[in-house]
């Protein structure tokens, strides 16, 4: 099932038991990219994507802002510190966390229609 863009973030939140760390209102995602290698994300992630990673440091926000990534989902229950969350809010990037592994999250996101 292919979802409309405005349905994808709510579907993603439900699919992976995500907990928002920043405001999600009005944010839309159009696809998903999964990688822990920042240079890979810089080279391949597209604007408006949901980025799935275990990385929680401030460089994640810089990469997300550079590529105009709509939201970042941290897996394995990982959560960045308050300064990283504040930086994401200032950049308008949604941060989410899930207790699922990256592999589990990938499967559930695909099943929920979070793909192009």
Roles of regions detected by a PLM:
Residues 35-50, 54-116:
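Feature captures the catalytic cores and cofactor-binding loops of soluble hydro-lyases/lyases
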Residues 1-44, 109:
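Conserved catalytic and cofactor-binding micro-motifs
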């Amino acid at each position: 099932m292919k979802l409309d863009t405005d349905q994808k973030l709510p579907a993603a939140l439900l699919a992976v038991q995500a907990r928002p760390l920043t405001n999600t209102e009005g944010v839309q995602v159009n696809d998903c990219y999964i990688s822990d290698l920042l240079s890979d994300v810089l080279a391949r992630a597209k604007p408006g994507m949901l980025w799935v990673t275990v990385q929680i440091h401030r460089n994640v926000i810089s990469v997300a802002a550079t590529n105009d990534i709509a939201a970042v989902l941290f897996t394995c229950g990982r959560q960045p510190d308050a300064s990283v969350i504040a930086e994401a809010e200032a950049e308008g990037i949604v941060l989410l966390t899930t207790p699922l592994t990256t592999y589990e999250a990938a499967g559930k996101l695909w099943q929920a229609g979070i793909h192009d």
